[in-house]
C-alpha cells in the first residue's frame, strides 16, 4: 500500500516570493529535514526563475520541468533550466522534462526536442525526457468535480502517463 502526505500552500498569494533570502533558506532547510522521512518529496513550484523557485529546485533529487508546446512555456522552461544549471548552490543536475497536454506522442516528442536542442546548443546539457502526458478531457472533468484524476477516471490516458512517470521516478 502506498501513502503520501500533502503540505498545501496558498495558491497565488505571492508570500513565497516575498520572503527574504534567509527565510527561504530556513524554509528549504525545514523541507530537507522533513524529506528525510520520505522516499520522495515533490515540491510544486510556479513557473519562472525567481529566487524562491531556483532555491527549492536545488533540493537534492531529480528536478522535473513541466512544459507544453506553447512558446512561452518552452521559453520559461529553458530559462529555468539555464538558471538552475548555472546556480552554484544548485544540486539539481538531474533535470528531466515532462511534456504536458501533448496532442499526440509525436507532438510531445517535438516539444521535448525543441527544448532539448536549445539546452544542448546554448547550455551544453541535454535534459532527459521523463514522459509525455497526453491532452485528455478526463483531466478537465476531474478538475471540475474536484476529484483526483485517477479516482474519477482510473483508465484515463493522462493518468496512465502520470503513473508511468511516477513509477519510473520510484525506480
Residue ranges and their predicted role:
Residues 28-40, 50-72:
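Inter-motif core of Ras-like GTPase G domains
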Residues 17-19, 45-56:
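Conserved ATPase-coupling elements of RecA-like P-loop NTPase cores
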Residues 88-90, 119-126:
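Short helix-capping segments at alpha-helix termini
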Residues 122-150, 162:
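Beta-strand-loop-alpha "switch" segments that mediate conformational coupling across diverse proteins
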Residues 74-92:
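Conserved C-terminal guanine-recognition region of P-loop GTPase G domains, centered on the G4
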Residues 68-69, 95-110, 132-139:
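G-domain G4 guanine-recognition motif of GTPases
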Residues 153-171:
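A cross-taxonomic marker for long C-terminal extensions/tails that follow the last structured domain
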Residues 1-36, 89, 141-148:
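P-loop/Walker-type NTP enzyme "switch/lid" segment
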Amino acid at each position: 500500500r502506498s501513502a503520501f502526505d500533502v503540505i498545501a500552500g496558498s495558491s497565488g498569494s505571492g508570500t513565497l516570493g516575498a520572503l527574504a533570502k534567509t527565510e527561504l533558506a530556513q524554509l528549504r532547510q525545514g523541507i530537507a529535514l522533513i524529506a528525510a522521512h520520505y522516499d520522495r518529496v515533490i515540491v510544486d513550484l510556479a513557473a519562472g526563475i525567481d529566487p524562491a523557485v531556483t532555491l527549492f529546485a536545488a533540493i537534492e533529487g531529480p528536478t522535473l520541468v513541466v512544459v507544453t508546446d506553447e512558446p512561452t512555456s518552452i521559453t520559461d522552461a529553458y530559462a529555468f533550466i539555464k538558471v538552475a544549471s548555472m546556480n552554484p548552490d544548485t544540486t539539481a543536475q538531474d533535470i528531466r522534462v515532462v511534456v504536458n497536454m501533448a496532442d499526440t506522442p509525436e507532438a510531445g516528442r517535438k516539444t521535448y526536442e525543441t527544448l532539448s536542442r536549445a539546452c544542448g546548443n546554448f547550455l551544453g546539457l541535454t535534459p532527459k525526457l521523463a514522459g509525455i502526458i497526453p491532452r485528455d478531457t478526463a483531466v478537465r472533468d476531474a478538475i471540475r468535480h474536484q476529484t483526483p484524476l485517477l479516482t474519477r477516471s482510473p483508465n484515463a490516458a493522462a493518468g496512465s502517463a502520470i503513473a508511468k512517470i511516477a513509477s519510473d521516478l520510484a525506480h
